[in-house]
A protein has these predicted regions:
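A short alpha-helical element within helix-turn-helix/winged-helix DNA-binding domains
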Residues: 37-48, 62
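Extreme N-terminal segment that seeds HTH/winged-HTH DNA-binding domains in transcriptional regulators
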Residues: 1-37, 43, 84, 88-105
Length: 105
């Protein structure tokens, strides 16, 4: 089961963005596999001490990107295939390059 416990409100990055990044890094790195279930929104919100709507926002964005599939009353499932893994790797690399360039300015 995935552990979101290392995410922090004190990080300065909105928690929904941290959740997005954590799941995307897991998909890109292969540590979160196709078919794996994500913890429920309530479990993650209780663990992080945030409103369930915050977790819902992250899960909704992941679903819009085609990385997870959600059904009412059921856990969300990762549906990222090799093409999605490759796409996520590219996105993360582009973000890293942007951040590095911004830090150099």
């Amino acid at each position: 089961m995935l552990s979101f416990s290392h995410l922090s409100l004190a990080d300065g990055v909105p928690i929904y963005q941290q959740i997005l990044r954590y799941v995307k890094l897991g998909i890109a790195g292969g540590t979160i596999a196709h078919g794996e279930e994500l913890p429920s929104r309530r479990v993650v919100s209780a663990l992080l001490g945030v409103n369930p709507n915050t977790v819902q926002k992250a899960y909704r964005l992941l679903e819009e990107e085609g990385l997870i599939l959600s059904h009412t009353g059921a856990k969300s499932t990762v549906v990222a295939d090799e093409a999605a893994q490759s796409r996520v790797r590219g996105e993360l690399l582009q973000a890293e390059v942007r951040d590095t360039i911004a830090a150099m300015k």
